[in-house]
Amino acid sequence: MSSIEGPVRVRFAPSPTGSLHIGGVRTALFNWLCARHYGGQFILRIEDTDEKRFVPGAADDISASLRWVGIDWDEGPDVGGPYGPYVQSERFEQGIYQPFINQLLEAGLAYMSFTTEEELAQMRAAAEAAGIKAFRFRGPERDWPLERQREEAASGKPYTIRLKTPLEGETRFRDLIRGGDEIVVQNNQLQDIVLIKSTGMPVYHFAHLVDDHLMKITHVMRGEEWVPSTPYHVLLYDFFGWPRPVFAHLPAILRQDGRGKLSKRKDDVATQRFRERGYLPETIFNYLALQGWSYDGVTEIMTRDELIARFTLERIQPSPARWNPEKLRDMNGIYIRKLTTEQLAERVLPFMQRAGLIGDPASETERAYLISLIPLIHERLEELQEAPDLLAFFYQDVVPGETYNPADLIPKKHDAAQTVALLRAAHEALSQQTDWTPPALETTLRALCEQLQVKPGPLFGAIRVAITGRSVAPPLFDTLAGVGRERSLSRLAAAIAALENLA
């Protein structure tokens, strides 16, 4: 897989700037699958050096989201490891980065820049006015001796530390996902990027690279938006004399219409939202594995173990993936139908509790009743959040004029008086029913249709609305059995009374 000797070590290194985007989970998943397939280690590292964008609690959200999907880590903030700490701010406090920036300064490969933000803005404006499309900053201090830089810093002037990029030549690197072809960048197209901010905090370009080296990361898998920054990272590896990792930049995930990338700012794609809507973690795991990777171009439903066995970096596609909410929803339905009745009841229970239909904690009676109802919705459910609405009439009163419009009871080609007659006959027949099971109820009601010489559709439709308040509901005989004898007869009586006022 690479020329690097030793075990595969990969990492997912998110910034705690908000809820974890589903695209971030895809990046974590590909790294995790790589580690598990090749028998290596997966490391979680929190990169919190951006103080302005830091969101308290975001790191915990990231960990919780990853664990929910089924991604665990061999080393990380909460599990430790031989190369900790695994939070960059903690590494900064321990002075881990300082020797390395000093090494670059001493070698003349980095320099202290005293250019202020205001001066930088003026330079950009002047370049734009002069028709220069790509402003590339190279500070005058790059030619100063280090002693002069230190004297200037000692005077109290704020400064950043910038990479001293070569003015000539070219920087080359390979990307595994792009066929391993060499990517060539002319050094005069680069600029002197900031490595250390004026606060002393290292930026991503510097901190992640030092961490990757010290943590012995062998493969850097990240989004393709980092391709333009990779020449700087390659220069730093070469300046330090460190072996480069294998670079594998993952394809973007586009919106369904193909117009732009999926965005956590514009699209409802926070991982927590999928959990709240009732997507199974197995679904998210499977679907995200297919966002830029394919086993054989045909097989889509794969278990966790199958994905581990089949995953290879060579089958990651360079072309963008496209997000398809309908396909994701369909896949969730498939995984829901793989669950047993008891398993689905357990998954649905929190949604029923949040809707106020079942107590928290649920009693054994409530659990048993929910399990009895699950078969009625098992084949129809696509998202777990749909369950409370589909099952509400089993738990709540159905009242004509409140739950439904009494006019909805009237079948096509019938009037109110005719419908009253149908429902009265049904009420009378069912009130004599002692065996309240679906087969017995079906026998009774079909016999009633023959007796009344009516088609089942109008009668069953009117009963369905009376019992559920809806024209579409689970199978009628199962519904009657689930609602129970007393409540069913009461609802039929209420429907008859409401219709009599219309007749």
UniProtKB/Swiss-Prot annotation:
Q: How does it assemble?
A: Monomer.
The gene coding this protein:
gltX
Task: Identify the species of origin.
Answer: Chloroflexus aurantiacus (strain ATCC 29366 / DSM 635 / J-10-fl)
| Motif 'KMSKS' region: positions | 261-265
CDD domains on file: GluRS_core
Q: Name one GO biological process term.
A: glutamyl-tRNA aminoacylation
**Could you tell me what this protein is called?**
Glutamate--tRNA ligase
**Any idea which positions bind ATP?**
K264
Q: Which UniProt keywords apply?
A: Aminoacyl-tRNA synthetase, ATP-binding, Cytoplasm, Ligase, Nucleotide-binding, Protein biosynthesis
Q: Which PANTHER family match?
A: GLUTAMATE--TRNA LIGASE, GLUTAMATE--TRNA LIGASE, MITOCHONDRIAL-RELATED
Question: Where does the protein end up?
Answer: Cytoplasm
Tell me where it mainly resides: cytoplasm
